[in-house]
Amino acid sequence: ACLGFGKSCNPSNDQCCKSSSLACSTKHKWCKYEL
């Protein structure tokens, strides 16, 4: 399963939900919406 908004993540292994337009922030290390 992919990671939802606000979940902690690893930028080098981005597991955030792409279908929800989420991406792992390299700065904050959590899933945020890509605009």
Swiss-Prot record:
GO CC annotation, single: extracellular region
Keyword Disulfide bond on entry: yes
Source organism, top-level taxon: Eukaryota
Pfam families recorded: Toxin_12
Cysteines paired by S-S bonds: C2-C17, C9-C24, C16-C31
Subcellular location: Secreted
Tissue expression pattern: Expressed by the venom gland.
Keyword set, alphabetical order: Disulfide bond, Ion channel impairing toxin, Knottin, Neurotoxin, Secreted, Toxin, Voltage-gated sodium channel impairing toxin
MF GO annotations: ion channel inhibitor activity; sodium channel regulator activity; toxin activity
Note: Negative results: does not inhibit Nav1.5/SCN5A, Nav1.8/SCN10A, and presumably not Nav1.9/SCN11A voltage-gated sodium channels.
Domain remarks in the Swiss-Prot or TrEMBL record: The presence of a 'disulfide through disulfide knot' structurally defines this protein as a knottin.
Similarity-based family: Belongs to the neurotoxin 10 (Hwtx-1) family. 22 (Htx-4) subfamily.
Task performed by this protein: Gating-modifier toxin that reversibly and voltage-independently inhibits human Nav1.1/SCN1A and Nav1.7/SCN9A (IC(50)=111 nM). It also shows moderate inhibition on Nav1.2/SCN2A (1 uM inhibits current by 55%), Nav1.6/SCN8A (31%), Nav1.3/SCN5A (27%) and Nav1.4/SCN4A (23%). This toxin inhibits Nav1.7/SCN9A by interacting with the S3b-S4 paddle motif in channel domain II.
Protein name in UniProt: Mu-theraphotoxin-Hd1a
